[in-house]
Amino acid sequence: MIQPTVKMPKKSVKERQQQVLEVLIGLLNSEDGMQRVTTERLAKAVGVSEGALYRYFPSKTKMFEALIERIEQTLTGYINASKRKENTTASTVKAILYTVIEFARKNPGVTRILTGHALMFEDDQLKARVAKFFDGLEFQFANILQMSKLREGKTFEDERALAGYLVNFCEGQFLRLVRSNFSYNQHQHFEKQWALIKPLFE
């Protein structure tokens, strides 16, 4: 008896885009994550031709942009959760710092993008996009500091400067992770580092 041929449904463009991004971040997360991800290498990992990749994204720059946008959305979700959960400005900032750094530790590929190490041979517009990401993070911190006036009656001399300092702290932790090839354990030092930051909120 001849068995009927069952055709597997083709993946939609959106599903293929998702697959490409997952494979891309997988390559960046790997031990070879510091090596340049060429379209040839990416296509091979996805299991399609290089030409097929460009049916899902017009350029590699667009792939990285989509990935950075996803990173931004994920971290914004975590930040909003911390804002809902915590009751004071200090505890909110501490929770966000811890969450952002933990996210960086668990996602080496993401961290390599945000420090620029994964973008060294890519379009300069991606570096501008990463700068925009950090500007957004600074805005989130500044907003939390401004809201403290309504929530706790507390004001800060320069919310933007303090927000910038908090972002610089995050960036420094990212760079330390990359430099140590993610062997650095920031949890051993976080409480002591926070003890130095906390007085800024008292």
Curated annotation (Swiss-Prot):
Q: What does the record give under GO molecular function?
A: sequence-specific DNA binding
UniProtKB keywords: Cell cycle, Cell division, Cytoplasm, DNA-binding
Top-rank taxon, per record: Bacteria
Q: Which InterPro entries match?
A: DNA-bd_HTH_TetR-type_CS, Homeodomain-like_sf, HTH-type_Tx_Regulator, HTH_TetR, NO_SlmA, SlmA-like_C
Domain HTH tetR-type intervals? 14-75
Which cellular compartments is it found in?
A: Cytoplasm, Nucleoid
Biological process terms in GO annotation: cell division; negative regulation of division septum assembly
Q: Which GO terms describe its cellular component?
A: bacterial nucleoid; cytoplasm
- Positions of the DNA-binding region: 38-57
Q: What is its main location?
A: cytoplasm
Q: Which family does it belong to?
A: Belongs to the nucleoid occlusion factor SlmA family.
The entry describes its oligomerization and partners as:
Homodimer. Interacts with FtsZ.
Q: Could you tell me which PANTHER family the record lists for this protein?
A: ACREF/ENVCD OPERON REPRESSOR-RELATED, ACREF_ENVCD OPERON REPRESSOR-RELATED
Summary of the function given for this chain in its UniProt record:
Required for nucleoid occlusion (NO) phenomenon, which prevents Z-ring formation and cell division over the nucleoid. Acts as a DNA-associated cell division inhibitor that binds simultaneously chromosomal DNA and FtsZ, and disrupts the assembly of FtsZ polymers. SlmA-DNA-binding sequences (SBS) are dispersed on non-Ter regions of the chromosome, preventing FtsZ polymerization at these regions.
Question: Which protein is depicted?
Answer: Nucleoid occlusion factor SlmA
Species source reads Actinobacillus pleuropneumoniae serotype 5b (strain L20)
Classification of source organism: Bacteria, Pseudomonadati, Pseudomonadota, Gammaproteobacteria, Pasteurellales
Coding gene?
Answer: slmA
